[in-house]
């Protein structure tokens, strides 16, 4: 076996051994991932295995039409078949979690990510999204060719003002319920293993710290028991939104709102221990987040 330092950055291996890594992204060489996984399972204190995630959007080795093109067929079977093939190929490379499907309702063609979704109609987006989830996850996530799906971006990301990515949105509750939330409710009912929060803020509140979306609707109304992950550094990005003063406040607000996993940025690992000591984040909140993650 090659020296560990040549397989993966030493710092990541060290942190994995210390139990400070919960997931990794975009490792497509099974030999590399197996080494990181071995360390997590055999050498860390709790022995909790890692999950390897990647953007498997419209194919892995075999590339299919973009989701917007698939939606133009008005045939959900296309989305399900493509996702099933992609899951089979990705799982063979050690990937067990994809950040797809994107089920944002999109109306503005200026938005750069419009091609990643299924369009503007909530019924069609719901049906195509559910089909993709079924294709990725198969009959059971325990099957070796199944990977966890991630319905994204919760919610309203496609309504970014002026079509500018990461921009603010101004969506009323009626618009949310009649339009933007419909595909996500369908995804929850279809058993989507994970949901990803959106980059945008709505009326000044970023999605990663929005208790109306993450608690009132997702957990209390829809009884969702899956995992909620932030988008890439969207927790720390709340500082740029002007919603949080610093990383500590970002960790506080995102955790208490119901974001279980912070992607890429490290406000949780830096500040949650102190926030717990100060009584600003309860152990019940931490335990609930851990349960949601371990179920995945």
Short names for language-model regions:
Residues 1, 9-296:
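Glycoside hydrolase catalytic-domain context in secreted enzymes
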